[in-house]
Amino acid sequence: MTIHHDLSPTLNLIRLANGEGLDLPAYESKGAAGMDLRAAVDEAAPLTLLPGKRALVPTGFIFEIPEGFEGQVRPRSGLAFKNGITCLNSPGTVDSDYRGEVKVLLANLGEEAFVISRGMRIAQMVIAPVTQMRVAEITEASETMRGAGGFGSTGV
């Protein structure tokens, strides 16, 4: 018999006025890596994203991401495939010391206008560990089998 203990860190959220009535960000399945983020746009004024345009879409929440972690904002595959809606600067990083509203930078790469309505799942956030490294300047790089070979250097 396996006994599971929940030792997961807690993600504290502050609901802003524009987030009233929205579901909390949530994992939609037991194996989901990312929690869905919803649009906190005005119900009476949905946002229309024209082809080739971008918009910063509010989520209605401030995230208190635990120290040692980051939030990675990523596109939802269904929106990208079906409508050409994606996140720019993907993944977008939400640092653990950021205390403003989380917003999602969406772009319409499709051929038709796309309407973003209140509560629509617009992106996902993956919480991931962060390592901060010491930085040291050196005069020569160590040798490796690959060397300075870049794009395509290991084969197609």
Curated annotation (Swiss-Prot):
Its EC number is 3.6.1.23. One of its GO terms (molecular function) is magnesium ion binding. GO terms for biological process: dUMP biosynthetic process; dUTP catabolic process. Substrate binds at residues 76-78, 89, 93-95, 103. It catalyses: dUTP + H2O = dUMP + diphosphate + H(+). Keywords: Hydrolase, Magnesium, Metal-binding, Nucleotide metabolism. The keyword Cytoplasm does not apply. InterPro entries: dUTPase (IPR008181), dUTPase-like (IPR029054), dUTPase-like_sf (IPR036157), dUTPase_trimeric (IPR033704). Pathway: Pyrimidine metabolism; dUMP biosynthesis; dUMP from dCTP (dUTP route): step 2/2. Its cofactor is Mg(2+). It comes from the Bacteria. This enzyme is involved in nucleotide metabolism: it produces dUMP, the immediate precursor of thymidine nucleotides and it decreases the intracellular concentration of dUTP so that uracil cannot be incorporated into DNA. NCBIfam families: dut (TIGR00576), PRK00601.1 (NF001862). Belongs to the dUTPase family. This is Deoxyuridine 5'-triphosphate nucleotidohydrolase. It comes from Rhizobium johnstonii (strain DSM 114642 / LMG 32736 / 3841) (Rhizobium leguminosarum bv. viciae).
